[in-house]
Amino acid sequence: MSAAETAAEVLAGLGYTNVFTTPPSALVCCEPIVLSSVGWERESRQADGTERGRERVRVLVCCDGAADAEATCRAVERDLRHAVWPAGCAGGERVVAVDTGMPLAAGRDGSGRWLWGFDATFTVVRDFG
C-alpha cells in the first residue's frame, strides 16, 4: 500500500468522504480530494531487512468555490500533519512521519472548478518479511 493510499484511508477515517488516489469522473465526485504518489526514494536498508525512505505525495483539492477549495486544502494539510498513523504495516508499508508543504492555489481545471494543492513527504518503512 502506498503512502497516498494510507493517507487516503486516514482522511476517510477523519470524515472526508471525497478522497481518491486517482482523479475521479465529475459524475462520480464533483469536488474531489486527490492524493497521487509522485515517487519513492530509499534512504537506507535496516539491519532487520526493512527499508526506510521517503515517498512524495501530491494533494490536490478541487471545489466549485475558490474559498471552499482553499479552506478544504488547508484543513486537509493540517489533518495530515497532525494525523496519528496506523502502527500496523498495511501491505508492507508503514508511515512513521509526514512533512507537508504550504497549500497554494493551482488555478482552475477544465470545467472551471478551483484547485488548491500541496506536496507532502512521507517517511515510510517498508517491510518485505
Language model features: what each stretch is:
Residues 51-69, 74-76, 114-126:
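Oligomerization/assembly interface segments of phage tail-like spikes and tubes
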Residues 81-129:
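Acidic-leaning, charged glycine-interspersed low-complexity segments
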Residues 10-13, 59, 103, 127:
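Acidic/proline-rich low-complexity IDRs
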